[in-house]
Amino acid sequence: MKSVRVQPASNILGSVSFPGDKSISHRYGMLAALAEGTSRFKNFSTGADCASTLSCMEQLGAKVTHKDDGVIEVEGVAGQLRKSATQLDCGNSGSSMRMLSGILAAQPFDSELMGDASLSRRPMRRIVDPLKQMGGDIETTDGHAPLRVRGSKLTAIDYITPVPSAQVKSCVLFAGAFAAGITSVDEAIRTRDHGEIALKAFGAEVERRQNRVSVRGGAKFRAIEAVVPGDISSAAFFLCAAALFPTSNLVFDGILLNPSRAAILDVLASMGAKPKFLQVQEQHGELVGTITLAPAGLSGLKISGGLTASLIDELPVLAAIGAYTRYGIEIRDAKELRVKESDRIAVVCANLRAMGAEVEEFDDGLRVKGSQKLHGAEIESHEDHRIAMAFAVAALRAEGETVINGADCVAISYPEFFDTLNKVVER
Protein backbone atom coordinates (compact mmCIF):
# COMPACT_ATOMS: atom_id res chain seq x y z
CA MET A 1 0.00 0.00 0.00
CA LYS A 2 1.17 3.51 -0.83
CA SER A 3 2.03 6.20 1.72
CA VAL A 4 1.60 9.93 1.07
CA ARG A 5 3.39 12.71 2.96
CA VAL A 6 1.33 15.83 3.70
CA GLN A 7 3.00 19.09 4.72
CA PRO A 8 1.27 21.93 6.60
CA ALA A 9 -0.39 24.58 4.40
CA SER A 10 -0.59 28.36 4.65
CA ASN A 11 -3.72 28.83 2.53
CA ILE A 12 -6.23 27.24 0.12
CA LEU A 13 -6.84 29.03 -3.19
CA GLY A 14 -8.25 28.27 -6.64
CA SER A 15 -11.16 26.63 -8.41
CA VAL A 16 -12.09 22.96 -8.16
CA SER A 17 -14.54 20.58 -9.80
CA PHE A 18 -15.17 17.03 -8.68
CA PRO A 19 -15.80 13.59 -10.18
CA GLY A 20 -19.46 12.69 -10.52
CA ASP A 21 -21.36 11.96 -7.35
CA LYS A 22 -20.82 8.35 -6.34
CA SER A 23 -24.36 7.75 -5.05
CA ILE A 24 -25.95 9.08 -8.24
CA SER A 25 -23.47 7.28 -10.52
CA HIS A 26 -24.27 3.90 -8.93
CA ARG A 27 -27.99 4.37 -9.44
CA TYR A 28 -27.67 5.78 -12.96
CA GLY A 29 -25.42 2.88 -13.95
CA MET A 30 -27.87 0.24 -12.73
CA LEU A 31 -31.01 1.83 -14.17
CA ALA A 32 -29.32 2.64 -17.49
CA ALA A 33 -28.43 -1.04 -17.82
CA LEU A 34 -32.10 -1.93 -17.33
CA ALA A 35 -33.39 0.74 -19.71
CA GLU A 36 -34.36 0.57 -23.35
CA GLY A 37 -31.85 2.52 -25.44
CA THR A 38 -28.41 3.95 -24.79
CA SER A 39 -27.82 6.35 -21.88
CA ARG A 40 -24.95 8.85 -22.02
CA PHE A 41 -23.28 10.29 -18.93
CA LYS A 42 -20.74 13.05 -18.57
CA ASN A 43 -18.71 13.24 -15.35
CA PHE A 44 -19.62 9.73 -14.21
CA SER A 45 -17.78 8.81 -11.01
CA THR A 46 -14.18 7.76 -11.61
CA GLY A 47 -13.98 5.73 -8.40
CA ALA A 48 -13.45 1.98 -8.13
CA ASP A 49 -16.83 1.47 -6.44
CA CYS A 50 -18.80 2.73 -9.44
CA ALA A 51 -16.51 0.79 -11.76
CA SER A 52 -17.65 -2.31 -9.85
CA THR A 53 -21.28 -1.41 -10.55
CA LEU A 54 -20.62 -0.98 -14.28
CA SER A 55 -18.67 -4.25 -14.41
CA CYS A 56 -21.54 -6.13 -12.77
CA MET A 57 -24.07 -4.63 -15.19
CA GLU A 58 -21.88 -5.69 -18.12
CA GLN A 59 -21.85 -9.25 -16.78
CA LEU A 60 -25.66 -9.05 -16.72
CA GLY A 61 -25.89 -8.08 -20.39
CA ALA A 62 -25.48 -4.31 -20.64
CA LYS A 63 -22.83 -2.80 -22.92
CA VAL A 64 -20.64 -0.08 -21.39
CA THR A 65 -18.46 2.13 -23.60
CA HIS A 66 -15.90 4.66 -22.34
CA LYS A 67 -15.60 7.37 -25.00
CA ASP A 68 -12.46 9.43 -25.65
CA ASP A 69 -14.20 12.63 -24.47
CA GLY A 70 -14.88 11.11 -21.03
CA VAL A 71 -18.51 10.26 -21.77
CA ILE A 72 -19.73 6.86 -20.62
CA GLU A 73 -22.41 5.15 -22.72
CA VAL A 74 -24.55 2.37 -21.29
CA GLU A 75 -26.59 0.36 -23.78
CA GLY A 76 -29.46 -1.11 -21.80
CA VAL A 77 -31.18 -4.47 -22.08
CA ALA A 78 -34.78 -3.19 -22.00
CA GLY A 79 -35.48 -5.07 -18.77
CA GLN A 80 -34.07 -8.37 -20.04
CA LEU A 81 -31.00 -8.99 -17.90
CA ARG A 82 -29.15 -12.23 -18.52
CA LYS A 83 -27.65 -14.58 -15.97
CA SER A 84 -23.98 -13.96 -15.27
CA ALA A 85 -21.69 -16.87 -16.03
CA THR A 86 -19.62 -16.10 -12.93
CA GLN A 87 -19.96 -14.47 -9.52
CA LEU A 88 -20.73 -10.75 -9.57
CA ASP A 89 -17.73 -9.08 -7.91
CA CYS A 90 -18.77 -5.90 -6.09
CA GLY A 91 -15.23 -5.17 -4.88
CA ASN A 92 -15.40 -2.77 -1.93
CA SER A 93 -18.82 -1.39 -2.86
CA GLY A 94 -21.67 -1.90 -0.42
CA SER A 95 -23.88 0.23 -2.68
CA SER A 96 -23.33 -2.16 -5.59
CA MET A 97 -24.09 -5.25 -3.52
CA ARG A 98 -27.11 -3.97 -1.63
CA MET A 99 -28.91 -2.19 -4.45
CA LEU A 100 -28.14 -4.78 -7.11
CA SER A 101 -29.56 -7.47 -4.81
CA GLY A 102 -32.92 -5.72 -5.01
CA ILE A 103 -32.86 -5.88 -8.81
CA LEU A 104 -31.61 -9.47 -8.97
CA ALA A 105 -34.23 -10.71 -6.51
CA ALA A 106 -36.86 -10.17 -9.22
CA GLN A 107 -35.01 -11.71 -12.19
CA PRO A 108 -35.79 -15.14 -13.71
CA PHE A 109 -32.37 -16.55 -12.80
CA ASP A 110 -30.07 -17.06 -9.83
CA SER A 111 -27.05 -14.91 -8.99
CA GLU A 112 -24.19 -14.80 -6.53
CA LEU A 113 -22.59 -11.58 -5.32
CA MET A 114 -19.18 -11.38 -3.67
CA GLY A 115 -16.89 -8.63 -2.42
CA ASP A 116 -13.46 -7.97 -1.00
CA ALA A 117 -12.47 -8.67 2.60
CA SER A 118 -13.75 -5.30 3.81
CA LEU A 119 -17.14 -5.62 2.11
CA SER A 120 -17.46 -9.20 3.38
CA ARG A 121 -17.44 -7.85 6.95
CA ARG A 122 -20.30 -5.42 6.39
CA PRO A 123 -23.90 -6.28 7.44
CA MET A 124 -26.26 -7.60 4.77
CA ARG A 125 -29.25 -8.86 6.78
CA ARG A 126 -30.72 -5.36 6.54
CA ILE A 127 -31.55 -5.99 2.87
CA VAL A 128 -32.44 -9.66 3.26
CA ASP A 129 -35.39 -9.02 5.59
CA PRO A 130 -37.40 -6.71 3.28
CA LEU A 131 -36.59 -8.75 0.18
CA LYS A 132 -37.85 -11.91 1.89
CA GLN A 133 -41.03 -10.05 2.88
CA MET A 134 -41.53 -9.37 -0.84
CA GLY A 135 -41.14 -13.07 -1.64
CA GLY A 136 -37.46 -12.96 -2.49
CA ASP A 137 -35.09 -15.85 -1.86
CA ILE A 138 -31.70 -14.59 -0.71
CA GLU A 139 -29.05 -16.23 1.47
CA THR A 140 -26.11 -14.65 3.25
CA THR A 141 -22.96 -16.09 4.76
CA ASP A 142 -23.66 -15.55 8.46
CA GLY A 143 -25.29 -12.22 7.64
CA HIS A 144 -22.51 -11.15 5.28
CA ALA A 145 -21.32 -11.62 1.70
CA PRO A 146 -21.18 -13.69 -0.42
CA LEU A 147 -24.91 -13.46 -1.18
CA ARG A 148 -26.90 -16.03 -3.15
CA VAL A 149 -29.99 -14.58 -4.82
CA ARG A 150 -32.56 -16.89 -6.37
CA GLY A 151 -34.84 -15.02 -8.76
CA SER A 152 -38.48 -14.88 -7.64
CA LYS A 153 -41.78 -13.20 -8.38
CA LEU A 154 -42.02 -10.32 -5.93
CA THR A 155 -45.05 -8.75 -4.28
CA ALA A 156 -45.20 -5.13 -3.14
CA ILE A 157 -44.82 -4.30 0.56
CA ASP A 158 -45.01 -1.33 2.91
CA TYR A 159 -41.64 -1.28 4.64
CA ILE A 160 -40.42 0.74 7.63
CA THR A 161 -36.62 0.95 7.67
CA PRO A 162 -35.17 -0.08 11.06
CA VAL A 163 -31.96 1.93 10.48
CA PRO A 164 -31.45 5.06 8.37
CA SER A 165 -29.96 3.70 5.14
CA ALA A 166 -30.35 5.06 1.63
CA GLN A 167 -28.86 1.82 0.29
CA VAL A 168 -31.60 -0.24 1.94
CA LYS A 169 -34.27 2.18 0.73
CA SER A 170 -32.97 2.00 -2.86
CA CYS A 171 -32.70 -1.79 -2.67
CA VAL A 172 -36.38 -2.10 -1.71
CA LEU A 173 -37.52 0.49 -4.26
CA PHE A 174 -35.51 -1.12 -7.07
CA ALA A 175 -37.07 -4.47 -6.18
CA GLY A 176 -40.46 -2.75 -6.00
CA ALA A 177 -40.09 -1.52 -9.58
CA PHE A 178 -40.37 -5.20 -10.61
CA ALA A 179 -42.96 -6.29 -8.02
CA ALA A 180 -46.72 -6.67 -8.35
CA GLY A 181 -48.39 -3.60 -6.81
CA ILE A 182 -47.08 -0.44 -5.17
CA THR A 183 -44.09 -0.74 -2.85
CA SER A 184 -43.61 1.93 -0.17
CA VAL A 185 -40.72 2.71 2.16
CA ASP A 186 -41.16 4.78 5.33
CA GLU A 187 -38.18 6.29 7.15
CA ALA A 188 -38.13 7.67 10.68
CA ILE A 189 -35.14 9.76 9.59
CA ARG A 190 -35.08 10.78 5.95
CA THR A 191 -31.98 9.67 4.03
CA ARG A 192 -30.54 10.78 0.70
CA ASP A 193 -33.15 10.48 -2.03
CA HIS A 194 -31.10 9.74 -5.17
CA GLY A 195 -32.76 6.34 -5.67
CA GLU A 196 -36.27 7.71 -6.00
CA ILE A 197 -35.09 10.67 -8.08
CA ALA A 198 -33.23 8.35 -10.46
CA LEU A 199 -36.18 5.95 -10.74
CA LYS A 200 -38.41 8.84 -11.79
CA ALA A 201 -35.81 10.19 -14.24
CA PHE A 202 -35.65 6.79 -15.97
CA GLY A 203 -39.44 6.57 -16.27
CA ALA A 204 -40.74 4.77 -13.16
CA GLU A 205 -43.91 5.98 -11.45
CA VAL A 206 -42.75 7.38 -8.11
CA GLU A 207 -44.62 9.28 -5.40
CA ARG A 208 -43.00 11.06 -2.44
CA ARG A 209 -44.72 12.40 0.67
CA GLN A 210 -42.50 13.60 3.49
CA ASN A 211 -40.57 10.52 4.71
CA ARG A 212 -42.56 8.04 2.60
CA VAL A 213 -41.71 7.10 -0.97
CA SER A 214 -43.61 4.68 -3.23
CA VAL A 215 -42.92 3.06 -6.60
CA ARG A 216 -45.38 1.22 -8.85
CA GLY A 217 -44.28 -2.18 -10.12
CA GLY A 218 -43.96 -3.06 -13.78
CA ALA A 219 -41.73 -0.07 -14.56
CA LYS A 220 -40.38 0.36 -18.09
CA PHE A 221 -37.12 2.24 -17.98
CA ARG A 222 -35.99 4.56 -20.79
CA ALA A 223 -32.46 5.81 -21.48
CA ILE A 224 -31.40 9.32 -20.46
CA GLU A 225 -28.52 11.73 -21.07
CA ALA A 226 -27.11 13.46 -18.00
CA VAL A 227 -24.17 15.32 -16.52
CA VAL A 228 -23.54 13.77 -13.10
CA PRO A 229 -23.16 16.54 -10.50
CA GLY A 230 -19.82 16.77 -8.70
CA ASP A 231 -19.71 14.60 -5.58
CA ILE A 232 -20.44 16.79 -2.56
CA SER A 233 -19.04 14.13 -0.22
CA SER A 234 -15.73 14.53 -2.06
CA ALA A 235 -16.12 18.32 -2.03
CA ALA A 236 -16.64 18.14 1.76
CA PHE A 237 -12.92 17.54 2.31
CA PHE A 238 -12.09 20.74 0.45
CA LEU A 239 -14.92 22.67 2.10
CA CYS A 240 -13.51 21.73 5.49
CA ALA A 241 -9.97 22.52 4.36
CA ALA A 242 -11.01 25.96 3.10
CA ALA A 243 -12.87 26.63 6.35
CA LEU A 244 -9.62 26.17 8.31
CA PHE A 245 -7.87 29.14 6.67
CA PRO A 246 -9.28 32.65 7.27
CA THR A 247 -8.06 34.04 3.92
CA SER A 248 -8.88 31.02 1.75
CA ASN A 249 -10.65 31.57 -1.57
CA LEU A 250 -11.88 28.41 -3.24
CA VAL A 251 -14.59 28.14 -5.92
CA PHE A 252 -16.53 24.85 -6.05
CA ASP A 253 -17.82 24.34 -9.57
CA GLY A 254 -20.77 22.14 -10.54
CA ILE A 255 -21.27 20.31 -7.24
CA LEU A 256 -24.36 18.47 -6.07
CA LEU A 257 -26.66 20.63 -3.91
CA ASN A 258 -29.44 18.11 -3.25
CA PRO A 259 -30.95 19.15 0.14
CA SER A 260 -30.67 15.57 1.44
CA ARG A 261 -26.90 15.73 0.88
CA ALA A 262 -26.02 19.39 1.49
CA ALA A 263 -26.05 19.25 5.30
CA ILE A 264 -22.28 19.81 5.26
CA LEU A 265 -22.97 23.35 4.02
CA ASP A 266 -25.50 23.96 6.80
CA VAL A 267 -23.09 22.65 9.44
CA LEU A 268 -20.18 24.77 8.26
CA ALA A 269 -22.47 27.81 8.11
CA SER A 270 -23.65 27.18 11.67
CA MET A 271 -20.00 27.15 12.77
CA GLY A 272 -19.27 30.42 10.96
CA ALA A 273 -18.14 29.47 7.42
CA LYS A 274 -21.05 30.53 5.24
CA PRO A 275 -21.45 29.34 1.62
CA LYS A 276 -22.25 31.79 -1.18
CA PHE A 277 -24.29 30.35 -4.06
CA LEU A 278 -23.10 31.69 -7.42
CA GLN A 279 -25.25 29.50 -9.68
CA VAL A 280 -27.91 26.83 -9.08
CA GLN A 281 -29.89 24.73 -11.58
CA GLU A 282 -31.82 21.46 -11.72
CA GLN A 283 -30.83 18.45 -13.82
CA HIS A 284 -33.03 15.33 -13.87
CA GLY A 285 -34.44 16.27 -10.46
CA GLU A 286 -31.03 16.93 -8.86
CA LEU A 287 -29.85 20.42 -7.83
CA VAL A 288 -26.35 21.37 -8.96
CA GLY A 289 -24.46 24.62 -8.63
CA THR A 290 -21.31 26.65 -8.12
CA ILE A 291 -20.45 28.03 -4.69
CA THR A 292 -17.72 29.67 -2.64
CA LEU A 293 -17.16 29.60 1.10
CA ALA A 294 -16.66 32.64 3.32
CA PRO A 295 -14.21 31.28 5.91
CA ALA A 296 -14.31 32.30 9.55
CA GLY A 297 -13.14 30.91 12.86
CA LEU A 298 -15.12 27.71 13.35
CA SER A 299 -17.08 27.57 16.60
CA GLY A 300 -17.74 23.83 16.86
CA LEU A 301 -21.02 21.97 17.41
CA LYS A 302 -22.80 18.77 18.43
CA ILE A 303 -24.11 16.49 15.68
CA SER A 304 -26.87 14.00 16.53
CA GLY A 305 -30.17 12.48 15.39
CA GLY A 306 -31.28 13.19 11.84
CA LEU A 307 -28.28 15.42 11.22
CA THR A 308 -25.97 12.47 11.86
CA ALA A 309 -27.79 10.43 9.21
CA SER A 310 -27.55 13.31 6.72
CA LEU A 311 -23.80 13.64 7.29
CA ILE A 312 -22.82 9.98 7.51
CA ASP A 313 -20.08 10.25 4.86
CA GLU A 314 -18.83 13.64 6.07
CA LEU A 315 -18.53 12.78 9.77
CA PRO A 316 -14.90 11.57 9.58
CA VAL A 317 -13.60 14.86 8.18
CA LEU A 318 -15.70 16.93 10.57
CA ALA A 319 -14.26 14.95 13.47
CA ALA A 320 -10.75 15.28 12.04
CA ILE A 321 -10.94 19.10 12.08
CA GLY A 322 -12.74 19.22 15.44
CA ALA A 323 -9.57 20.08 17.35
CA TYR A 324 -9.19 23.26 15.27
CA THR A 325 -12.66 24.56 16.20
CA ARG A 326 -13.15 26.81 19.19
CA TYR A 327 -15.36 24.52 21.29
CA GLY A 328 -14.80 21.14 19.64
CA ILE A 329 -17.10 18.70 17.86
CA GLU A 330 -19.27 15.98 19.37
CA ILE A 331 -20.89 13.28 17.23
CA ARG A 332 -23.63 10.99 18.57
CA ASP A 333 -26.18 8.49 17.13
CA ALA A 334 -23.49 7.35 14.69
CA LYS A 335 -23.22 3.58 15.36
CA GLU A 336 -23.46 3.08 11.59
CA LEU A 337 -19.88 4.38 11.36
CA ARG A 338 -18.68 1.20 13.06
CA VAL A 339 -19.77 -0.97 10.10
CA LYS A 340 -18.38 1.10 7.24
CA GLU A 341 -15.16 0.24 5.37
CA SER A 342 -13.51 0.46 8.78
CA ASP A 343 -14.76 1.08 12.30
CA ARG A 344 -14.65 4.80 11.62
CA ILE A 345 -15.30 5.82 15.23
CA ALA A 346 -12.37 3.81 16.58
CA VAL A 347 -10.07 4.68 13.69
CA VAL A 348 -10.77 8.43 13.83
CA CYS A 349 -10.14 8.44 17.59
CA ALA A 350 -6.89 6.50 17.25
CA ASN A 351 -5.56 8.76 14.50
CA LEU A 352 -6.52 11.95 16.33
CA ARG A 353 -4.71 10.70 19.42
CA ALA A 354 -1.66 9.96 17.26
CA MET A 355 -1.69 13.65 16.27
CA GLY A 356 -1.88 14.70 19.92
CA ALA A 357 -5.60 15.41 20.21
CA GLU A 358 -7.72 14.91 23.29
CA VAL A 359 -10.70 12.82 22.17
CA GLU A 360 -13.36 10.77 23.94
CA GLU A 361 -14.87 7.69 22.30
CA PHE A 362 -18.49 6.57 22.81
CA ASP A 363 -20.34 3.51 21.58
CA ASP A 364 -22.26 5.71 19.13
CA GLY A 365 -19.79 8.50 18.45
CA LEU A 366 -17.01 10.66 19.83
CA ARG A 367 -16.12 14.05 21.27
CA VAL A 368 -13.10 16.07 20.14
CA LYS A 369 -11.94 18.86 22.43
CA GLY A 370 -11.60 22.24 20.70
CA SER A 371 -8.78 24.80 20.54
CA GLN A 372 -6.06 22.16 20.31
CA LYS A 373 -2.81 22.14 18.35
CA LEU A 374 -2.09 18.94 16.45
CA HIS A 375 1.28 17.63 15.33
CA GLY A 376 2.21 15.52 12.34
CA ALA A 377 2.07 11.76 12.80
CA GLU A 378 1.80 8.44 11.00
CA ILE A 379 -1.86 7.93 10.12
CA GLU A 380 -3.33 4.50 9.43
CA SER A 381 -6.07 4.60 6.79
CA HIS A 382 -7.16 0.98 7.39
CA GLU A 383 -7.79 0.98 3.62
CA ASP A 384 -10.72 3.37 4.19
CA HIS A 385 -10.84 6.15 1.61
CA ARG A 386 -12.69 8.63 3.82
CA ILE A 387 -10.21 8.16 6.67
CA ALA A 388 -7.24 8.83 4.37
CA MET A 389 -8.80 12.00 2.96
CA ALA A 390 -10.05 13.26 6.34
CA PHE A 391 -6.60 13.14 7.90
CA ALA A 392 -4.96 14.68 4.85
CA VAL A 393 -7.18 17.69 5.64
CA ALA A 394 -6.30 17.61 9.35
CA ALA A 395 -2.61 17.51 8.38
CA LEU A 396 -2.86 20.89 6.62
CA ARG A 397 -3.02 22.70 9.98
CA ALA A 398 -0.78 20.37 11.99
CA GLU A 399 2.77 21.17 13.03
CA GLY A 400 5.18 19.09 10.98
CA GLU A 401 4.80 16.39 8.36
CA THR A 402 2.00 13.82 8.41
CA VAL A 403 2.31 10.44 6.69
CA ILE A 404 -0.91 8.79 5.46
CA ASN A 405 -0.33 5.04 5.21
CA GLY A 406 -2.45 3.13 2.71
CA ALA A 407 -3.32 6.37 0.93
CA ASP A 408 -4.03 4.70 -2.41
CA CYS A 409 -7.41 3.61 -1.00
CA VAL A 410 -8.72 7.04 -2.09
CA ALA A 411 -9.19 5.38 -5.50
CA ILE A 412 -12.38 3.84 -4.09
CA SER A 413 -14.21 7.16 -4.49
CA TYR A 414 -11.80 9.92 -5.55
CA PRO A 415 -8.62 8.80 -7.34
CA GLU A 416 -7.64 12.41 -8.10
CA PHE A 417 -7.85 13.57 -4.47
CA PHE A 418 -4.16 14.18 -3.72
CA ASP A 419 -3.52 15.76 -7.14
CA THR A 420 -6.41 18.17 -6.59
CA LEU A 421 -5.26 18.93 -3.05
CA ASN A 422 -1.76 19.81 -4.25
CA LYS A 423 -3.20 22.20 -6.86
CA VAL A 424 -5.10 24.35 -4.33
CA VAL A 425 -2.76 24.27 -1.33
CA GLU A 426 -0.25 27.07 -0.71
CA ARG A 427 2.69 26.28 1.55
From Swiss-Prot:
The lineage of its organism: Bacteria, Pseudomonadati, Acidobacteriota, Terriglobia, Terriglobales. Disulfide bonds: none annotated. It is found in: Cytoplasm. The active site is at D313. Keywords: Amino-acid biosynthesis, Aromatic amino acid biosynthesis, Cytoplasm, Transferase. Phosphoenolpyruvate binds at K22, G94, R122, Q167, R344, R386. Belongs to the EPSP synthase family. GO terms for cellular component: cytoplasm. GO terms for biological process: amino acid biosynthetic process; aromatic amino acid family biosynthetic process; chorismate biosynthetic process. It catalyses: 3-phosphoshikimate + phosphoenolpyruvate = 5-O-(1-carboxyvinyl)-3-phosphoshikimate + phosphate. CDD domains: EPSP_synthase. Pathway: Metabolic intermediate biosynthesis; chorismate biosynthesis; chorismate from D-erythrose 4-phosphate and phosphoenolpyruvate: step 6/7. Its EC number is 2.5.1.19. This is 3-phosphoshikimate 1-carboxyvinyltransferase. Catalyzes the transfer of the enolpyruvyl moiety of phosphoenolpyruvate (PEP) to the 5-hydroxyl of shikimate-3-phosphate (S3P) to produce enolpyruvyl shikimate-3-phosphate and inorganic phosphate. InterPro entries: Enolpyruvate_Tfrase_dom, Enolpyruvate_Tfrase_sf, EPSP_synthase, EPSP_synthase_CS, RNA3'P_cycl/enolpyr_Trfase_a/b. It comes from the Bacteria. One of its GO terms (molecular function) is 3-phosphoshikimate 1-carboxyvinyltransferase activity.
